[in-house]
Each structure stands twice: as structure tokens, then as C-alpha cells.
Amino acid sequence: YVIEEILGLPEKKENNTPALARKIQQKLYREKHIGGVDVTGDPAGLQRSTTNEDGTNNYTIITETLGKGVLKPKIKLLKKQPPQVTRCEFVNEVFEGFDGWKLMIDLRCRKLTEYLIYQLKNEDGTKCKAKVTDAKTGVKYEKYGHLSDCLDYLLCYYLRDSWTKYKRGDGSMTILSTATINEGFNY
């Protein structure tokens, strides 16, 4: 069950790793959260190409910001980045009940829901990550992709037995071949 989304808003200058991590930390402290925090996402985020000028990657920034106190952040990543087409197909299968899973998303997760509805698919099966320009700031950004990517990585990590089963083609999957419709993902 996806309960809530916490977004870094550009107008509040929260759309960067340190600011969003602080926002999450403050929210969790306000709610007296003591159960620990798992930090997951794209395993490529550990690579040198994603570090800041000091050589620190986003996962280190997040765990250091959340601190060593009651939040006890732990990085939980897949060993390597799953192929985008395969992971998107897996997520669609999970939505269809693959391996007995039932995925529900709270109505308050408006941006995630928007991404899942409007994210387009390229002809090769990958996500269309077209950039748009913000009318107010003039800054280019990826309109759809980040939140659906987060969901992909989360499901591939936490449902890893089902993910492995799906990749191997195990299970009682029925494959239906039809004409390709490239209007959007099936999420």
C-alpha cells in the first residue's frame, strides 16, 4: 500500500537531495516516527557520475541528513539497475496481481497517480522522459518519470522474489500478444 508521497517543491527550493531529505526528516520527527527509514531507489545513484562536487552521492547525503538517531536510515538497493522495459512490464504485472500481490495507492498520492496515468511509452518499451520548460522559472525538467521510477525500484527491491521469478519467466503468467498501443503505460 502506497500511503503518502512527499515531494520537493521547486517554489520552496526543496527539489534537491539535501532539502528534500531535511523535509522528510522534519516530517518524520513531527510524527514521532521511530521505526527506522529504508532509503531505496536507482542503484546507479551510487556511481561517481552522480556525486556532488565533494564526491558525495545522494544516498550518503540522505542518510547523513536523516542522521543516526531514532530514524536509523538504511540504504537498501538492488545490486544493479534493472532493465527499464523489464521492470516496467513487471510493475504492470504486479498491478494485475502477479504472484498474488495487490498494489494499492492512496488517493492522496496525486503526483504518483498522475505519473502512472500520463507516463508515455516509447516504441522500444522504455519510458518517454521528455523534458518540458517551467513557465514561471524557465527551467527544463522531466515532467514524468521520477516517481514512477521510484515505484519501479521499490517494487523490484521489496518484491525481489517475485521480481526474480518474473525475470526467469517462472509462475503461471499468461502472455497475451496484441497490437502495440503507445499512448501510455498500463500502470
Predicted segment positions?
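Charge-dense, low-complexity polyampholytic segments
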Residues: W163-T178
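Acidic, Mg2+-coordinating catalytic module of metal-dependent nucleases/exonucleases
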Residues: T137-K167
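Mg2+-dependent endonuclease catalytic cores in nucleic-acid-processing enzymes, primarily RNase H-like
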Residues: Y1-K136, D161, I175, E183-Y187
